[in-house]
């Protein structure tokens, strides 16, 4: 038997990080078994679907390593409407479904509760199709439905507690439960790996599989992804769009490494693991069924580690969208003709150790490509206290006099200036750093001065001095 898994997102918004994790888990599971990964776009919500969301899904999958052309599809659920209707008719003709004209208000009036569920009122009324009549599945009165789940064992659901659920609306269109099952049957899906939130629907879907005469797939319900308050990640409340992380400058390798750790751990005590090792070691049976915390701070730290591990040439290439202004986040304040690739290459190894996401590169190097630094007034107020003017005067004199302009020489000169003013180097360099770079923190100061050059450094020190009494 060829293993066939599917990833079935809906094109109704940005691509959710939880969906990305499910896609990767399906992808690895199929790859380990020489199987097939099927992409099915569940596009039946015409009011919310947009072509750009579908393209966003394809682009996001490609970014995390699931390239176009390496999987089967994409198929579109809307293309299978005829199959959905045929399945609904089979269930009705076989006595496994019946028409119902009950409104919610009528059910509530009979049961006395808005939460009691459907009471089976129309089971034996022998209604035919018509306006206001939905098609309901006839759930068995006895027995239990056992779901074989690779992560959760064998959850068992008493059939008498499963209400007769709707499988087709009064206009004949199928609901999600039926369409999903029919599509999986049509595509020969053998394993369904998806989020825990779908588990309550699983006994209903398994009953549909059995009623249609097909062996159900093997199920695997991975833990739901939650925020720091243990709430399910929400598009309205949390930062969940994979594209947002990509655009901010997270690396794909860091992102997919982190996503795979949501509910699973590799061997040993390591967490940053080469992708081939993850592909080899991952086992669905080892996934923890408890909720998985999406820790953005930890992801950020992961990304910083991945950035620092890049060869410098790859780091320089990765920064290009932000340096050239083609990125959508953190546009550079300089004009294209002001950017100098050689200058950036000189400081790239210094910047590489100080950023956690690529978009931070602009704020770290902007002072190198502007005529004047962008002064952070808060940093200015803290650095330019009493005595700062005298210290800048002394630094200008010292920097003018040194015979060679390099990091070691400028450091020695400023150390001497600081000693004359009773200051250690850390205190002495604060006014100089703000005057030259505009910020209190950033790249190593003296290496930055070397790249900036003597004349530009002195020009900025003099400009800062003019602002002081």
From Swiss-Prot:
The UniProt record lists the keyword Protein biosynthesis: yes
Principal location: cytoplasm
Lineage: superkingdom: Bacteria
Cofactor note: Binds 1 zinc ion per subunit.
Cellular compartments per GO CC: cytosol
Subcellular location: Cytoplasm
Keywords from the named record: Aminoacyl-tRNA synthetase, ATP-binding, Cytoplasm, Ligase, Metal-binding, Nucleotide-binding, Protein biosynthesis, Zinc
Cofactor(s) demanded: Zn(2+)
Motif range ('HIGH' region): 9-19
UniProt: ATP binding residues: 235
Subunit structure: Monomer.
Family as reported in the entry's similarity comment: Belongs to the class-I aminoacyl-tRNA synthetase family. Glutamate--tRNA ligase type 1 subfamily.
Function: Catalyzes the attachment of glutamate to tRNA(Glu) in a two-step reaction: glutamate is first activated by ATP to form Glu-AMP and then transferred to the acceptor end of tRNA(Glu).
Name under which the protein is recorded: Glutamate--tRNA ligase
Organism: Salinispora arenicola (strain CNS-205)
């Amino acid at each position: 038997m060829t293993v066939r898994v599917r990833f079935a997102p809906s094109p109704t918004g940005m691509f959710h990080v939880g969906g990305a994790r499910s896609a990767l888990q399906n992808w690895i599971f199929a790859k380990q078994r020489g199987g097939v990964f099927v992409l099915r776009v569940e596009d039946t919500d015409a009011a919310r679907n947009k072509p750009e969301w579908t393209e966003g899904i394809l682009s996001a999958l490609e970014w995390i390593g699931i390239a176009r052309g390496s999987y089967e599809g994409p198929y579109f659920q809307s293309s299978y409407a005829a199959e959905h209707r045929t399945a609904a008719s089979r269930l009705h003709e076989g006595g496994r479904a019946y028409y119902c004209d009950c409104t919610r208000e009528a059910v509530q009036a009979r049961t006395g509760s808005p939460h009691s569920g459907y009471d089976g009122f129309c089971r034996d009324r022998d209604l035919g199709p018509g306006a206001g009549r939905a098609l309901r599945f006839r759930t068995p009165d006895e027995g239990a439905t056992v779901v074989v789940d690779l992560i959760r064992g064998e959850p068992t659901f008493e059939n008498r507690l499963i209400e007769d659920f709707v499988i087709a609306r009064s206009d004949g269109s199928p609901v999600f439960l039926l369409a999903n099952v029919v599509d999986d049957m049509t595509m020969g899906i053998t394993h369904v790996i998806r989020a825990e939130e779908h588990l309550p629907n699983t006994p209903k879907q398994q009953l549909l599989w059995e009623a249609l005469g097909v062996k159900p797939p093997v199920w695997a319900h991975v833990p739901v992804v939650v925020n720091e308050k243990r709430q399910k990640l929400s598009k309205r409340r949390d930062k969940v769009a994979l594209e947002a992380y990509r655009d901010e400058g997270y690396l794909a390798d860091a992102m997919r490494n982190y996503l795979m750790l949501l509910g699973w751990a590799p061997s040993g005590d390591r967490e940053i693991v080469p992708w081939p090792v993850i592909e080899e070691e991952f086992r669905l049976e080892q996934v923890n069924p408890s909720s998985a915390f999406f820790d953005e701070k930890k992801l950020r730290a992961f990304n910083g580690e991945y950035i620092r591990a890049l060869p410098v040439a790859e780091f320089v290439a990765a920064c290009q969208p932000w340096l050239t202004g083609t990125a959508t986040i953190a546009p550079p304040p300089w004009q294209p003709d002001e950017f100098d690739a050689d200058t950036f290459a000189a400081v790239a190894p210094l910047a590489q150790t100080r950023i956690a996401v690529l978009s931070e590169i602009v704020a770290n190097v902007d002072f190198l490509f502007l005529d004047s630094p962008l002064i952070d007034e808060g940093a200015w107020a803290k650095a330019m206290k009493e005595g700062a003017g005298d210290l800048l005067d002394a630094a200008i004199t010292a920097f003018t006099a040194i015979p060679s302009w390099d990091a070691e020489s400028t450091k020695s000169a400023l150390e001497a200036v600081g000693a004359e003013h009773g200051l250690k180097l850390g205190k002495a360099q604060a006014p100089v750093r703000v005057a030259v770079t505009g910020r209190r923190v950033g790249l190593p100061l003296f290496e930055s001065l070397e790249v900036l050059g003597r004349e530009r450094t002195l020009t900025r020190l003099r400009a800062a001095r003019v602002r002081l009494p």
